[in-house]
């Protein structure tokens, strides 16, 4: 069975609840970390069987933070330019450029 993901690598997204801007750096077809705690969002089997995303976001000090989010937790980001989060714009553009022009190996 093929699972389709809504978001792609290099795409900018927003956390639905917290509003943080982030960039997708990897996609898992389903939850793939250790067994979650019962009170964790990942304990929901419906969410665990849907795509999960490795997303880089910035904390309140502007430092990059790696997060692991369910597809239900993020939404599309319509703008490609964010003056207050220009490092996320740069990361997104860098990833997309690398995907479009992969390096050849010898």
Swiss-Prot record:
User: In the UniProt record, does the keyword Methyltransferase occur?
Assistant: no
GO cellular component terms listed in the entry, alphabetical order: cytoplasm
Determine if Cytoplasm is one of this entry's keywords. Answer: yes
Subcellular location(s): the record lists: Cytoplasm
Q: Which UniProt keywords apply?
A: Cytoplasm, Stress response
Superkingdom of this protein's organism: Bacteria
Task: Identify the Pfam families for this entry.
Answer: YccV-like
Q: Which SMART domains match?
A: YccV-like (SM00992)
- Output compositional bias ranges, type Polar residues: 90-100
Which one GO biological process term can you cite for this protein? response to heat
NCBIfam families named in the record: PRK14129.1 (NF010729), yccV (TIGR02097)
What this chain does, per the entry, is described as:
Involved in the degradation of certain denaturated proteins, including DnaA, during heat shock stress.
Q: To which protein family does this belong?
A: Belongs to the HspQ family.
Q: What is this protein called?
A: Heat shock protein HspQ
Species annotation:
Proteus mirabilis (strain HI4320)
Q: What is the lineage of its organism?
A: Bacteria, Pseudomonadati, Pseudomonadota, Gammaproteobacteria, Enterobacterales
